[in-house]
Amino acid sequence: MTDFEDNPCNAPLHPRAADGLRLFNAGEYFEAHEALEDAWNAEKGIVRDLYRGILQIAVTYLHITRGNYNGAIKVYGRSLKWMKDWADVCRGIDVAGLRRDAETVMREVTRLGIENIREFDLTRLKPVSWDQGFRKQKQIYVCDRCGSEMFEKNCKVTCPNCGNRFDCSDLNIYFD
């Protein structure tokens, strides 16, 4: 058994999650949400909840940029459920830092209240810190059936999410 089978935080980041983090860090919160939602839908393991939590923080920040106090409060409240039980670092993502940053943002949003939300200083929306080289591989194998990332073992691959077996000729291969 590999260490990422024992601990899902040790596995590589889904490629669409990486796209989502890059978009999040560029302040493109709607697009980040879309990419992270793709990763969340493709992922069948427990780490999908981490992607869900991050995408909800992206939506929270989107609401803040649009001056939508109620939307920010509501979506941030939902994100707490998905963000609370993760290791401080998971799949190279500084989860603890993101939680702290989001809590700081929401304290300020709450302080401003619905009447003054448009006064929120957008420079308080910090990027997600993550190790872009974490478990980076030269080739990423993606299951044609469920879209999950797989790992080669002598050109025989089993999808960790749906259990389908493939040989290398059956796979979509993406190069970094």
Which sequence ranges carry the predicted segments?
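Residue-level recognition of tetratricopeptide repeat
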Residues: L21, V59-Y61
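TPR/TPR-like (Sel1-like) alpha-helical repeat modules
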Residues: Y69-A87
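Residues immediately within or flanking Cys/His clusters that coordinate Zn2+
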Residues: I140, K156, R165
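Short cysteine-rich clusters marking metal-coordination/redox-active sites
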Residues: C143-C146, C159-C162
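Cys/His-rich microdomains that often coordinate metals
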Residues: M150, F166
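Short Cys/His-rich "knuckle" micro-motifs
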Residues: K153-K156, S169-N172
